[in-house]
Amino acid sequence: MVGLCACNPWEQPEEEKDIPLAIFKTFWEQMDKHYTCFEEHFVNWDSIYYTNISQVNELQNTEDLVPIFQSILNTLKDPQLWIGVPQKASIQYRLNGSLESHGITTAKGTDFFIDNKNNEYLPSHQIYTLRLSHKCEDREFHFAYVSALSFRNKNATIYKPLLEQVAQLQPDGIIVDLRYNNKGEFPTMIEFVRQFYEGNRPILYTVQRESEENRYNMTHPEPYSIDGEGTVPDSIPIIVIVNFLTFGPANVCAYILQALPNTTVIGQTTTSGGGSSVSGVSLTHNWALHFSNDVKYYVNWHCCESPLHLNVLVSESSAIYEEYIIDGHKEVLFIDSSIATAINLLESMIPWKTSPLGIFNATGRLVE
């Protein structure tokens, strides 16, 4: 997607026909010197040059560079890459898809989750109680739902008291929904994840380039350790839900939580990104480039720029209806398939006294 101002930022004097070539060469050279994720994105950077240079040589206007740069950025699939003319035009890899409504509603159509429409950037949470039965045993099942809608800096102080409130209610499990996270900042995401563990632990490893001459010569991994606050006891099972809209800090958040005890990540494959630091350089003729200047790895040695490796794959969310006993009352609920899977997984972790191992649905029926 390319935004243009009313005055064409690529307009140039007729005699300066070599400008597109100069911009392309400068772009390629700066990426070759500084970019760190060629291997992670399976891109042969020399091939990118030789594939495009003939076409660039024939260009008459800088505007004609747009589809070439867009194709290159789409190949790299790195949302942190940006090239353009500051304040005038930009070219960037953009995610496809639109936000969808999600959650649980009653059959009557009333909202069962906290309404987020007027609170777009703030987290929401709710506690649900389901009554489960099997043989001679009845028990209540409490689960918490936490939707981390944003990791913007203004939310940095919100998550701890919210999770303290959740933990005080001692739920049987917590569902953390990252599917609709509106990006944000790395420090706010870290403030969120450190509530789920206690003590000092490495959560990421950073690798940088050792020189500009060799794009594949990298430093030894340096651990990035953060003290956890342990607001949520690690004895509480956590189900994290993600999908293709989960990228940037939310993707990193899911990876870090996945490495903690008692955590399962479900849903659809994430888009990636979010862990690497970003730098910018000036190109020629007022063009600029922003890029990732390091590579971060999780404790399982998966790259932050890679889509998350799911524990449980759930087909794209679809509407299903199930009958639940909630606070002693029977209700028919609409639940998307990812949340339904999360509930079933949490139910399977309940220490039933009389039942064999298995997964129970909300009415206590054993799922073979």
Protein language model features and the residues they cover:
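Sec-dependent bacterial lipoprotein signal peptides
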Residues: 1-5
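C-terminal "post-core" interaction segments
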Residues: 8-25, 144, 173, 182-368
